[in-house]
Amino acid sequence: MMEPYVTSLIRMLSQMGYTDVSYSSKERELNLRHVYLKTTAHFVQPSTRLGTDVKRMQAFIQTIVRMMVYSYPKLPLDVMSDLSIYYTYTVILDDCKQRTADTMQTFTVDLIHGSEQRHPWWQAVNQHLPSLLKHYGPFCSMTIFRSTLDFFQGCWIEEHEFQGFKNSHNYPEFLRRMDGLGHCVGASLFPKQDFDESKHIPEISTVIAEMEQWEMHVNDLLSFYKESSDSSDQANFVTNYAHCTGCSVEHSLSRLTDSVITSGNAMTTTLADKDGRIKEVVEGFMQGFVTRHLTDPRYRIQELVQQTQNSRLSGQEELTTFWKAAMEVGDVDHKLWAFPPLQEMMHGNE
């Protein structure tokens, strides 16, 4: 599967014209530092960590801070920081092994009546959401909240480790849309201090519609090597789709790549003659989101590049060129920005 996978990566990177020029090295480092300190300070209190081990929490924060700074280069730093805290909560939930159903018996009624939720994750997130949503107008705020509900329900389904029944062709996409946070990503690009929702609903809703597919499927594509190599992480979108539809994994991978290219082209061509600021924000996200994946060690792209070179696979030179371009702008050692560690900040807060 390595050669078809490399072909898919090159197709995607070539079609989007990957060239990330959003930051100078110093700007990237300074933004990482700022967002790291704000995010870590939030999770000093035990109630915010929801029982997550401190070492694991440190890894979550560093992962999300990189994602935020790389993917949202046009976002004001205060918005970036509050969004970083929000996304860290989503990682905590995704990692949680606690069964959800017991604390969800009254969720809907409590939501309608404005009563406190019983699930500890919702208690913590509801404390933070007003701080995040104050940065957005009513349309984007509703979209972010609705996407949060979908994400929670998607994680609820995933607790059952259910890959989908064979012949249920729509199930893999249904689940992926629920837990992909694509609508949240699309809406979060447009804080009210930079964009007047009332003037840009058509453009914003179009970005949300296309970003849902693009963001989650880029993540699926760039995660595929890591997930395929990890025996504990075999169930991924590519294999789930192949399982449910009966197609080959190679066909599923090709279909995924087509989806990324189609939705990416739809965004760039649709916005080409629209407000230049919207186009700039969306393109900045797309370039940075890819840089984040290509440079983050957890996705093991460097290992993939080395394997393609050693095997002299077709496309290895092109993939190496893209990877080196990403590393040139995005390879920032966490020791330059991820300090002091959460453990130390917790002791200082005692």
PLM regions: where:
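Alpha-helical, largely C-terminal catalytic domains
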Residues: 1-350
